[in-house]
Amino acid sequence: MTRIRRGNIARRRRTKIRLFASSFRGAHSRLTRTITQQKIRALVSSHRDRDKQKRNFRRLWITRINAVIREIGVSYSYSRLIHALYKKQVLLNRKILAQIAISNKNCLYMISNEIIKEVDWKESTGII
């Protein structure tokens, strides 16, 4: 069996991997075997953290909305507000509500009061 020379193909593959790991420190950017291991590890972490980021932002939005509601000092909670929005079929998601809460607290106060009043009135009269 003859020997296969893979100089060009292997070099191209290694340089492509090295370009990915050029910003890594120490042997992680110089040794081929550790570069491949670190590349796999980096890609796994980035994939995992993309899902984590979605969770973290949702938690942040909920915290911001809840903080503004408590600061205003109204008699209802975050969960009641979200339930009322759902019942009323208002298309304001948590991200938009959090932006409104930061930029204009009075606007959020007016929105929440209107929605809570209508839902409470319908529940008390037995319409829902």
UniProtKB/Swiss-Prot annotation:
InterPro entries linked to this entry: Ribosomal_bL20 (IPR005813), RIBOSOMAL_L20_CS (IPR049946), Ribosomal_protein_bL20_C (IPR035566)
Location within or outside the cell: Plastid, Chloroplast
Signal peptide: none
Superkingdom of the source species: Eukaryota
Pfam family, one: Ribosomal_L20
Major site of localization recorded for this protein: plastid
GO CC annotations on file: chloroplast; ribonucleoprotein complex; ribosome
Parts of the chain that traverse the membrane: none
GO biological process, one term: translation
A GO molecular function held by the record: rRNA binding
Keywords recorded for this protein, A-Z: Chloroplast, Plastid, Ribonucleoprotein, Ribosomal protein, RNA-binding, rRNA-binding
Function: Binds directly to 23S ribosomal RNA and is necessary for the in vitro assembly process of the 50S ribosomal subunit. It is not involved in the protein synthesizing functions of that subunit.
Record family assignment: Belongs to the bacterial ribosomal protein bL20 family.
Name of this chain's protein: Large ribosomal subunit protein bL20c
Gene source species: Daucus carota
Gene: rpl20
